[in-house]
A protein has these predicted regions:
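Short active-site neighborhood of thiol/selenol oxidoreductases, capturing the structured segment around
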Residues: 493-509
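Terminal connector regions
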Residues: 442-470
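Surface-exposed binding patches on compact interaction domains or structured appendages
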Residues: 367-377, 399-434
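C-terminal motif of bacterial Sec signal peptides marking the signal peptidase cleavage site
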Residues: 17-18
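Beta-sheet-dominated interaction scaffolds and their linkers
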Residues: 364-399, 438, 442, 469, ...
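N-terminal "domain-start" segment that seeds a small globular fold
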Residues: 466-494
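Short acidic/proline- and small/hydrophobic-mixed sequence motifs that coincide with surface turns
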Residues: 390, 401-406, 444-445, 491
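Feature marking well-ordered beta-strand scaffolds used for ligand recognition
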Residues: 22-365
Length: 509
């Protein structure tokens, strides 16, 4: 009697390929809807604003922004925002550049602005009276600038207003308290407190001021007596603490590399860190609305469910990009830096490097979210001899709330390969793509890496690949370079011969 196993063995002997392990099924993309949906990209007179702060006022649905300029936006319909006033620049004594601002706060029709100062601009407190309509267009405002306050030795950062008092972070000088003369609009200092560290962010609730310090702390200050403020307590947040938002007894701090930090300040004399959540980039500013914390984190804007303060839960993120006119064909759009954020319920307002955006939050949705390193925009394999290879590992991560499928990874040039061609990552999981360059000539070679995934916000990501690239590049010698320094001396690259050299870009804003 012939057994079934004998038949199977005979068939396999005749057709070996038919009995080999079946090929794995190809990975197919899932179908997801993003928790954050774009409503509007607001293009005004200027398309490169470098927005620092945006703040939303619920009483009239105005959105205020500080950037290269100051502006007021009608945000009653977040999908159809419009400028009420824009491109306003401050006239500052002794400064011909007419700067914008970095921080803002309001007191009715008076909106205060501050600038910390830099190599090109002096520091100041000023602002705008927005009570007047434009006679040529009654739908728009015609703001008038407030008098400028400049105090010897001071530098001004975050600002907030409560009960007619204006509270300003003075960096290494602590916190300053001011009052405005209603007739002249001139600010005068009424009190101050030092010894707080390098202060940056300010929010006031009743008679308590919450202040962040760049050393990584949140401080509480009693201002019941404005002339004699008193330090109440301090919580160590870690990182570089900048922006903050306060709701009831809870404070939310954007703490740089520490990400989002949640502080319980129910005991003002002993505030305590109760929760943290990492951010992809440097957390700069934060807002709070209806159980959610919204974080401007340099590389993206992020939303967390903070209904359980000890365990902030990531909901979603938005990475905004802009096209840059690179000379190379195939370069990916660059990440547009995000420094400002504001929220009203499910309406999210993002202050991007270029222009403001509005998004609608759908907190009930789950979706994958692909994170790639910024250097993917220019992956330089350095000099490689003809016929030789060089492999670079690229970290990929799914920061989303459901599995991420990279269902098609490929390159446009035979000189470059990527493996694996498909990859699946669970929520929160990281993996690697191996990029290999095989030099086919001694000349420069270029290609584009394509990553197709089921991330609903960025289903197609690309990277620019170069090998044997001309000019300054990874692994290539630095040509003789001379630099005139600000102190009048000179620096030459020969001074750092055979040493690793960091080339840094610096600009003043």
């Amino acid at each position: 009697m012939l057994k079934l196993s004998d038949i199977t063995l005979s068939v396999c002997a005749l057709t070996v390929s038919a009995c080999s392990s079946p090929a794995p099924s190809p990975l197919l993309p899932g179908r997801y809807e993003s928790p954050l949906v774009l409503m509007q990209r607001l293009q005004g007179e200027v398309g490169h604003l470098h927005i620092d702060e945006v703040r939303y006022r619920a009483s009239d649905a105005n959105l205020f922004q500080c950037s290269y300029t100051f502006g007021v936006i009608d945000a009653r319909d977040p999908s159809s925002m419009r400028y009420l006033a824009e491109n306003l620049r401050h006239t500052i004594p002794g400064d011909r550049r007419r700067p914008g601002c970095i921080h803002l706060a309001w007191d009715g029709d008076v909106v205060y602005t501050t600038h910390r100062g830099n190599l090109s601009n002096p520091t100041f407190i000023s602002g705008w009276d927005i009570s007047t309509k434009d006679p040529e267009d009654r739908r728009r405002m015609k703001p008038t600038q407030l008098p400028v306050l400049q105090e010897a030795g001071e530098s001004y950062e975050g600002i907030d207003v409560e009960n007619g008092f204006v509270y300003v972070a003075l960096k290494d000088r602590g916190l300053g308290i001011y009052r405005r003369n209603a007739k002249t609009n001139v600010l005068s200092r009424v009190g101050s407190i030092g010894g707080l560290g390098s202060t940056w962010g300010v929010r006031v609730r009743n008679q308590t001021v919450f202040v962040t310090a760049l050393e990584g702390s949140l401080l509480t200050v009693d201002v019941a007596d404005a002339a004699h403020p008193k330090l109440l307590g301090k919580a160590t947040t870690g990182g570089v603490a900048r922006g903050l938002a306060v709701d009831g007894a809870m404070a939310y701090v954007a703490a740089g590399s520490e990400g989002l930090v949640v502080v319980d300040a129910s005991d003002l004399t002993n505030p305590k860190v109760v929760g943290k959540s990492p951010t992809r980039g440097t957390a700069v500013r934060v807002d709070y609305s209806q159980g959610h914390a919204f974080v401007a984190a340099w590389n993206d804007a992020r939303v967390y469910d903070v209904s359980r303060p000890a365990s902030p839960r990531f909901i979603g993120a938005v990475r905004l990009t802009t096209d840059v006119m690179y000379p190379d064909h195939g370069r990916a759009a660059a990440t547009g830096r995000t420094l400002g954020i504001a929220a009203n319920g499910n309406d999210v307002f993002i202050g991007n490097w270029w222009v403001p955006y509005s998004y609608r939050l759908h907190a009930d949705r789950t979706a994958p979210s692909l994170v790639l390193p910024e250097e993917i925009n220019l992956t330089d394999f350095g000099p490689v001899a003809r016929g030789e290879t060089h492999t670079i590992d690229v970290d990929v991560r799914n920061q989303g709330t459901t599995p991420l499928t990279l269902f098609s990874n490929w390159t446009t040039s035979n000189a470059f390969t990527v493996a694996p061609e498909q990859l699946k990552l669970a929520a929160g999981e990281s993996g690697k793509l191996q990029l290999t360059y095989r030099a086919t000539t001694g000349e420069a070679e270029k290609g584009v890496l394509n990553i197709w995934s089921d991330d609903p916000l960025q289903p197609v990501r690309t990277g620019f690949l170069v090998g044997n690239h001309g000019g300054l590049g990874v692994g290539q010698p630095l040509p003789e370079t001379r630099v005139a320094l600000l102190d009048g001396s000179q620096w030459t690259s020969s001074q750092v011969q055979k040493k690793v050299t960091l080339l840094a870009y610096f600009a003043t804003f």
